[in-house]
Amino acid sequence: YEVEPGDRVPALLLVPEGVDTKSPAPAVVVCHQHNGQWHLGKSEPAGLAGNPMHHTGVALAKLGYVVLCPDALCFEQRRIEQLRGGDYERFEFLRYVVSGKCMAWKNILDIRRAVDYLGTRREVQQDRIGCYGHSMGSTHTWLAGPWEPRFRCLVGNCCLPTYAAIHRTHLLHCFPNFIPGWFQYGDTPDIAGLIAPRALLLNFGENDGGSPIQEVRGGVKTIARAYAAANAADKFNYDIEPGSGHVLSDEMWKRTHQWFQRHLKA
């Protein structure tokens, strides 16, 4: 599907058995991780490659959801021969910066176009669309959430890196996390809080070095205040799993599909 003139996103659409235009189902956009594996994108959540832990798209399809797995910019089929791996990601980030934009802007746009595409599919219940992501995919999820009102329910797994934590720990994080100028107004949890009053679940590992836990604990309080102010305190939940790192544990996945069951299917 086209996201901008001349820019098309390769994606995989998973339609569960028994779902069709006469029996539509809720849908989930699944945003893949980064992990420095630029050769992997949509194929990992779709269950065709990568770590079975992150075959989440096919797992959701087996639970009855229509699932869209797109490639993020710089990954899998959205790479170029001239620049490989992190070089292309750095090039794209700087290209957007000098244009007054950033990769976060581009990722938000692409995800909104993914929802546009789902809007053309009669197999999808149009009022029941969600978003899930792990790691970079989590960042894409809570970044896109405020600007995509068609998302009824969102789940982010293992990624809420605050700029305060990045500066305190001298953490060299991936480019899609950075929005030029934003830190003078707030931090990343303030963005996630704009999703209120729609349903948002965030899972964290206590020992995840990519999201220093000290700032995560403060960040979820910021988000909770935003939900309380929107009279939607029950629509936000989070869990910090003791002893876990940057993973999708069995318990994290259990909370994820229960959240979708509650807010997309119920």
What are these regions (language model features)?
Residues 133-145:
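Glycine-rich nucleophile elbow surrounding the catalytic serine of serine-hydrolase chemistry
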Residues 1-23:
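N-terminal cap/lid segment of alpha/beta-hydrolase-fold proteins
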Residues 175, 222, 227-266:
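C-terminal catalytic histidine-bearing segment of alpha/beta-hydrolase fold enzymes
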Residues 206-215, 245-247:
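Acidic catalytic loop of the alpha/beta-hydrolase fold
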Residues 94-98, 113, 152-192, 197, ...:
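Mobile cap/lid helix-loop segments that gate and shape the active-site cleft of serine hydrolases
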Residues 23-24, 29-112, 119-120, 165-169:
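Cap/lid segment of the alpha/beta-hydrolase catalytic domain
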Residues 195, 202-204:
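Short beta-strand/loop motif that positions the catalytic acidic residue
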Residues 122-135:
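Alpha/beta-hydrolase fold nucleophile elbow
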